[in-house]
A protein has these predicted regions:
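Conformationally flexible catalytic loops at phosphate/diphosphate-handling active centers
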Residues: 35-128
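A general structural motif
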Residues: 108-124, 141-149, 168-176
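A generic structural motif
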Residues: 36-41, 162-171
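Conserved thiamine diphosphate
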Residues: 1-35, 39-42
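Conserved small/polar residues in nucleotide/adenosyl-binding loops
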Residues: 182-184
């Protein structure tokens, strides 16, 4: 949490690819400017052979856009230092900026996902709801276990159990307020 990284989780290789394309836009957004990690289950998905739909390179390049840094590192008339070390009198300012970027990441993630849907036809949010509309029980899952979880929900539904699934995509900042609005 205190590192300031934004973890985006993927259920499968398609989501890992899609998250990677979106991650550049989220991380480089002027209201975020924080690193993102694309999280996928080691071996379960990382070593799996799975078909995915790739976007054309020119479409991805247009979507991601050119990197436009707020500050260039090598400007002799505007020198500044970059690094993980912060002296005592700067720590609070740095942490405050980091936390503000994390707070902003929720809306930026949703905005980028809407734009991504226009070019890919694939929709993403902060989390995915599966059969939650009338669920009495819900599984909360991250990563590749969601596929098995969805099959389990379907089996439970056939047995008359009103089960559902919530798959977390954006883990930090955690979408607690948004999750609290879901029916269960």
């Amino acid at each position: 949490r205190s590192t300031g990284w934004i973890p985006l989780f993927a259920e499968n290789n398609q989501e890992a690819y899609d998250n990677m394309v979106q991650a550049y836009r989220i991380a480089e957004h002027k209201d975020v400017r924080l690193p993102i990690m694309i999280c996928q289950d080691g071996f379960i998905t990382s070593h799996a052979v799975e078909n995915i739909e790739l976007l054309e390179d020119d479409i991805v390049k247009t979507f991601v856009g050119e990197y436009e840094p707020e500050h260039y590192l090598l400007k002799d008339n505007e020198p500044f230092a970059v690094g993980p070390y912060a002296v005592t009198n700067y720590v609070m300012e740095a942490k405050r900026a980091q936390m503000q970027g994390l707070r902003n990441a929720k809306q930026v993630t949703l905005d980028v996902a809407k734009e991504f849907e226009k070019i890919s036809g694939r929709s993403y949010g902060l989390f995915e709801e599966y059969r939650m509309e009338d669920a009495d029980y819900a599984m909360v899952i991250i990563g590749s276990a969601a596929g098995t979880g969805k099959d389990t929900v379907d089996m439970l539904r056939k047995q008359g159990v009103r089960a559902g699934l919530l798959k977390i995509r954006l883990f930090r900042p955690f979408p607690a307020e948004e999750l609290s609005l879901i029916h269960i």
